[in-house]
Amino acid sequence: MIKLSKKYCLGISFVLYILLSVCEGHKNLTCDFNDVYKLEFHPNQQTSVTKLCNVTPNVLEKVTIKCGSDKLNYNLYPPTCFEEVYASRNMMHLKKIKEFVIGSSMFMRRSLTPNKINEVSFRIPPNMMPEKPIYCFCENKKTITINGSNGNPSSKKDIINRGIVEIIIPSLNEKVKGCDFTTSESTIFSKGYSINEISNKSSNNQQDIVCTVKAHANDLIGFKCPSNYSVEPHDCFVSAFNLSGKNENLENKLKLTNIIMDHYNNTFYSRLPSLISDNWKFFCVCSKDNEKKLVFTVEASISSSNTKLASRYNTYQDYISNSSFLTLSSYCAFITFIITSFLSFIL
């Protein structure tokens, strides 16, 4: 039996951990200009350099940009990236993303230096319009001295190492199976309700407004409440009310994926699992004091046949994003590191 040295085992664990971590970062739809698409200047660099990070996420996946740190003085453009985006690679046509891609939600920011955002991310919204790209930029700027023909400094100029983030927003073939309680004609959800119109027509009717959707394996589901309403339960899609009105943890019954709980915009999304073993009904509520409750009910149905289920499942397998690999590689990296580190101490 070959006996491995501690240094050798630790070396293996370190290399595997780094390789899998790099793979993870790529699969996680992250444009990392600090460590992957580096924007550092090379010695004697005289011209600007551009690097492109192109990502093609699926709906509801998270895209992240890392631009600068406490040691890297990079600038993100626009500074409000993901709230605002550019519509072209030449940093023109600045758009508010909620107007450019209707249904956008879940922006997250992280600042490692004062008054500067270094990391941003957002979830890819359901999009019924044709596929479209959006852009943000990360820049590292430097002023250099240009020597004249005699070798003496003659002028100064700025050079820029620029990272371009190109995100292709995919297009859905059908609307999200869900309820929009803010408009009678929803651009995202399959059903729409205008609360003002309903209230005017039925001012004396105190019955709650119930919107029911029938969904199957892998279907996108969701709802949107008016801005002055609250959502019950607060963590809808993690938990929900059953038909008895009891709040239940859905993970014990129906493991939903790609959950987005955007309380700022009162918009919630999720996806049904690829396998549903039994019919299941649950609901969440938009509520406001002294107003009718707006009830979003989901009837999740077991597939009618194994053939149909297999067909839907295989179709979905092609659609599954690289984030599944991310989770696997994360565990592999961690477990590999632990095992090889342990071996280094016992061998």
Swiss-Prot record:
Disulfide bonds join C31-C53, C67-C138, C81-C136, C179-C211, C225-C286, C236-C284. It is found in: Cell surface; Cell membrane. It comes from Plasmodium falciparum. InterPro entries: 6_CYS_dom (IPR010884), 6_CYS_dom_sf (IPR038160), Parasite_Repro/Invasion_Surf (IPR051444). The gene is PF12. This is Merozoite surface protein P12. A lipid is attached at N322 (GPI-anchor amidated asparagine). Residues 1-23 form the signal peptide. Heterodimer; heterodimerizes with PF41. May form an antiparallel heterodimer with PF41. One of its GO terms (cellular component) is side of membrane. It holds the Pfam family s48_45. Glycans are attached at N28, N147, N200, N228, N242, N265, N322. SMART domains: s48_45. Residues 27-172, 175-305 form the 6-Cys domain. It is a lipid-anchor; GPI-anchor. The keyword Cell wall biogenesis/degradation does not apply.
